[in-house]
């Protein structure tokens, strides 16, 4: 090794020892001919000082991010000059020898200056990601990710799971998003697909008798670009044979508990569960944030005889903002704009004065009986504001769900270090295909119904006989785990019976021929004693970003894509030259090849 110690591990007890350090020049200061340098390596920073004239003279030429090797003696810092912000802050290294291992060009941005981190655009940070990663916060992210990998593996290994890699070049099998396709050079006109998940292969592993499988898997989805999505992402993928929902949930809770212990938080288990129906009814989301106690109150029945046309609708609901009546008029106007940005016409409201008098435009348009009873119905008191949404059930609840989150922010109800976990169970097995496409997903199949999770999710046992007769009523044997309003994992008990799988395909408008073409290898496997099985997949990027308190999943990925799906570092995706296009067969036209083959055959016959 070129060094004897790490910079961040030096302590005052080591005073008098001669050490050799390697790393980068984080800061350089010249105090009357004595040169001080903050030397950074993966462990942290140590102050090194150049007092001897010859070596100090050479140190004058050092600049930020020069890669250097120094040898010197560990000494206590002079009284009053200790730095409590550094683990090595009580010592310095008096350097006797300096070697410049490599110089650095002028930096595109300052690395160790905290004030510059917010000034550097993300595109620039990602273009020079190798410099951005030198920052301590980014080091923390990748070390935390490694620790999370290790913690999960320890739990799974203790339960006799086997880590197995599944293919990343496979055939295109629709799973709810578009595939990334890879041309097969040796078979022109044919394409591999990068997997959206290991779903089908892990089910085949259960048929193979592996019983307990896991993998930290790379997945790929060609989705429309969203602010906090990545075209390639990582999930912890788990599958088990001979289990029911409670078994998978118990294991998942053990994994999640181990992960949050990394940051010193003890999760109380069992984690509470709520049904999908209750999540939507009370929180307007299947990913409810339970760090604050604001619930949606249904008012449809309360306003069933109303003369107010806005409330003469399929659904009316409300949320209460404690103390919200004191907001100025411009703030209520801002609420209207906020709602319009979400596709609503506005956000109706009532204010309750300290004397109980109702104010706001809604109060003028409802009946005396409605005015007298509304506060009690929604649980509001003097000084509060009541916000309403009316219209179709889905969009109205979604608006109120967003409003409860906005209220929590305005009232500062969410504190640092708050964690709230829940399982959401009993989701619908199917949804209207139009709803799936409207939300940006790919609706698998050709009927008016498509799978909410995926086509291999089993109906709950009580719906096994009837799900194809009443698809809209059937519930899935599925479970999602939610943390602070983020879905961090989801899974289900799978279909293991070929006949049940065929019936699910029938509901989705996938005929026998198409099913065999796209999923035949799985359906064939089900003929050979497939065991009952189920599993779960955790969104690894999301979990690590939550654990570390990062704003974006891009912060916990070593080399992420930008929000537009572009890699500023390598400038991917890029074009390819004509020669490479020809070689890979990207432009292969089957009909043209067939015509040429026919002509060649005719020529030989003549």
UniProtKB/Swiss-Prot annotation:
One of its GO terms (biological process) is aspartyl-tRNA aminoacylation. Homodimer. It catalyses: tRNA(Asx) + L-aspartate + ATP = L-aspartyl-tRNA(Asx) + AMP + diphosphate. PANTHER family: ASPARTATE--TRNA LIGASE, MITOCHONDRIAL, ASPARTYL/LYSYL-TRNA SYNTHETASE. Pfam families: GAD (PF02938), tRNA-synt_2 (PF00152), tRNA_anti-codon (PF01336). PROSITE patterns: AA_TRNA_LIGASE_II. One of its GO terms (cellular component) is cytoplasm. It comes from Corynebacterium aurimucosum (strain ATCC 700975 / DSM 44827 / CIP 107346 / CN-1). Belongs to the class-II aminoacyl-tRNA synthetase family. Type 1 subfamily. Its EC number is 6.1.1.23. Keywords: Aminoacyl-tRNA synthetase, ATP-binding, Cytoplasm, Ligase, Nucleotide-binding, Protein biosynthesis. Aspartyl-tRNA synthetase with relaxed tRNA specificity since it is able to aspartylate not only its cognate tRNA(Asp) but also tRNA(Asn). Reaction proceeds in two steps: L-aspartate is first activated by ATP to form Asp-AMP and then transferred to the acceptor end of tRNA(Asp/Asn). One of its GO terms (molecular function) is ATP binding. Residues 199-202 are annotated as: Aspartate. L-aspartate binds at residues 175, 221, 453, 494. This is Aspartate--tRNA(Asp/Asn) ligase. ATP binds at residues 221-223, 230, 487, 539-542. The record marks 31, 80 as: Important for tRNA non-discrimination. Residues 564-606 are annotated as: Disordered. It is found in: Cytoplasm. Residues 579-594 have a biased composition (Basic and acidic residues).
């Amino acid at each position: 090794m070129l060094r004897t110690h790490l910079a961040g591990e030096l302590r005052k007890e080591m005073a008098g020892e001669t050490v050799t350090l390697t790393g980068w020049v984080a800061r350089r200061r010249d105090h009357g001919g004595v040169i001080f340098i903050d030397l950074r390596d993966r462990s942290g920073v140590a102050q090194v000082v150049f007092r001897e004239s010859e070596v100090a003279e050479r140190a004058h030429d050092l600049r930020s991010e020069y890669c250097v090797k120094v040898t010197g003696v560990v000494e206590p810092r002079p009284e009053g000059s200790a730095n409590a912000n550094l683990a090595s802050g009580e010592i310095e290294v008096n350097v006797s020898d300096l070697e410049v291992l490599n110089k650095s060009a002028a930096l595109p941005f300052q690395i160790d200056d905290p004030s510059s981190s917010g000034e550097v655009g993300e595109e620039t940070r990602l273009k020079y990601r190798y410099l951005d990663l030198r920052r301590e916060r980014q080091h923390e992210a990748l070390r935390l990710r490694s620790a999370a990998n290790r913690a999960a593996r320890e739990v799974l290994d203790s339960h006799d799971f086997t880590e197995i890699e599944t293919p990343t070049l496979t055939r295109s099998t629709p799973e709810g998003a578009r595939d990334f396709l890879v041309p097969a050079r040796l078979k022109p006109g044919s394409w591999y697909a990068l997997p959206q998940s290991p779903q089908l292969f892990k089910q085949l592993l259960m048929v193979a008798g592996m019983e307990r499988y896991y993998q930290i898997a790379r997945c790929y989805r060609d989705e429309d670009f969203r602010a906090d999505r990545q075209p390639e992402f990582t999930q912890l993928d788990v599958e088990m044979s001979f289990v029911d929902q409670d078994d998978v949930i118990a294991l998942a809770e053990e994994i999640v508990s181990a992960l949050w212990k990394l940051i010193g938080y003890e999760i109380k288990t069992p984690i509470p569960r709520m049904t999908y129906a209750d999540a939507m009814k009370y929180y307007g989301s299947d990913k409810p944030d339970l760090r604050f106690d604001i619930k949606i109150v249904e008012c449809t029945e309360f306003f069933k005889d109303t003369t107010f046309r806005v409330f003469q609708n399929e659904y009316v609901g409300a949320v209460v903002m404690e103390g919200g009546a004191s907001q100025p008029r411009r703030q209520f106007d801002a609420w209207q704009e906020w709602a319009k940005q979400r596709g609503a016409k506005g956000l109706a409201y009532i204010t309750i004065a300290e004397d109980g008098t109702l104010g706001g435009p809604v109060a003028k348009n409802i009946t005396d009986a409605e005015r007298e009873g509304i506060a009690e119905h929604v649980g509001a008191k003097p000084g509060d504001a009541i916000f309403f949404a009316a219209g179709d059930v889905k969009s109205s609840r979604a608006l109120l769900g967003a409003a409860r989150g906005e209220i929590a922010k305005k009232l500062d109800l969410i504190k640092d270090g708050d964690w709230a976990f829940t399982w959401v169970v009993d989701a619908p097995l199917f949804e209207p295909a139009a709803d799936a496409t409207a939300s940006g997903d790919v609706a698998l199949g050709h009927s008016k119904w498509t799978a909410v999770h995926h086509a291999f999710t089993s109906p709950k046992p009580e719906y096994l006989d009837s799900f194809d007769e009443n698809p809209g009523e059937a519930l899935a044997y599925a479970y999602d785990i939610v943390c602070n309003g983020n879905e961090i994992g989801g899974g289900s008990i799978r279909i293991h019976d070929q006949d049940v799988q065929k019936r699910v395909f029938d509901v989705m408008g996938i005929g026998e021929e198409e099913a065999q073409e796209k999923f035949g290898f799985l359906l064939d496997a089900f003929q050979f004693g497939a065991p009952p099985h189920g599993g779960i997949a955790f969104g690894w990027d999301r979990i690590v970003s939550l654990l570390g308190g990062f704003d974006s999943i891009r912060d916990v990925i070593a080399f992420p894509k930008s929000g537009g799906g572009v890699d500023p570092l390598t400038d991917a995706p890029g074009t390819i030259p004509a020669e490479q296009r020809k070689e890979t067969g990207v432009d292969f036209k089957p009909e043209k090849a067939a015509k040429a083959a026919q002509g060649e055959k005719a020529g030989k016959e003549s």
